[in-house]
Amino acid sequence: MDWFYAIIYGIVEGITEFLPISSTGHLIVAGNLMGVPWSKEIRDTFEVVIQGGAILAVLAYYWRDFAGQARVIGHDRPTQRLWLGVIVGVIPAVVLGVLFGDVIKAHLFRPSVVAWALIVGGVLMWVIENRKAPPVVHDLKQIGLGRAFLIGAAQCLALLWPGFSRSASSILGGMVMGLDRPTATRFSFYLGIPTLGGAALLDFIKSRHLLAEIGLLNVFLGAAVSFVVAYLAIGWLLRFVSQHNFKGFAVYRVIFGLLILLLVASGRLANGGL
């Protein structure tokens, strides 16, 4: 059955990683409903490692853009500034992860914590969508280093409060900083490459002996499914944000967070984490 769990985890990860609805919360519920027999350490590591598939989906989706940028980055200042902004934007997450990553993973991944992050994030998303300030940044190369750093700092909210969603925190941070929805969403994808890619690689190196218990082929199966589903989700989200706001996601987050709290209160979901 490990292959079945790997596929389901891959589907859930692929759908939810880049949508602003928290992959963590959905993986917790999915694992509970399936009754996955893996240890907490194995599940935690598996969930992080299959993010690698989602990251590869970003690289595949934007490969033409990246190839074009690679050809001109040596002399094109806007392209240089864009990627310097990505580097600057990821610094807060790197510092926070190095200093407090183990503590956060050990103590803050309880379902009730994730549920409240979903709810609060949904309310905040609604509030930000109701702001009257028009966006002033409509292209990735207009973001600048200051905005990039602050968006990266906003991204850290997902590290400090699991369930808030890295995508949601970075997209909302971008919108507060004046980016329009499509640009904020694209920059969130760019920030996700080093943030999630680094975390997935580090966890794989540190914990591959745990993953061997369920089979490395199952790990790669989960990552492959995550890749395919995430690729489709990226395309859908970009089309969606070009015509719609995030209020539907805000409502969904609140409802899903309340559902998790109900499952915890009824005893259907243990509140000690996965």
UniProtKB/Swiss-Prot annotation:
Gene Ontology molecular function terms on file: undecaprenyl-diphosphatase activity
Its membrane topology: Multi-pass membrane protein
Name of one Pfam family that matches: BacA
Gene Ontology cellular component terms for the protein in this record: plasma membrane
GO biological process: cell wall organization; peptidoglycan biosynthetic process; regulation of cell shape; response to antibiotic
Keywords assigned: Antibiotic resistance, Cell membrane, Cell shape, Cell wall biogenesis/degradation, Hydrolase, Membrane, Peptidoglycan synthesis, Transmembrane, Transmembrane helix
Reactions listed under catalytic activity: di-trans,octa-cis-undecaprenyl diphosphate + H2O = di-trans,octa-cis-undecaprenyl phosphate + phosphate + H(+)
Membrane-spanning intervals of the chain: 1-21, 48-68, 84-104, 108-128, 143-163, 187-207, 214-234, 254-274
Enzyme Commission identifier(s): 3.6.1.27
Top-rank EC class of the record's enzyme: hydrolase
Main localization category: membrane
Other information: Bacitracin is thought to be involved in the inhibition of peptidoglycan synthesis by sequestering undecaprenyl diphosphate, thereby reducing the pool of lipid carrier available.
Family note: Belongs to the UppP family.
Name this protein carries in UniProt: Undecaprenyl-diphosphatase
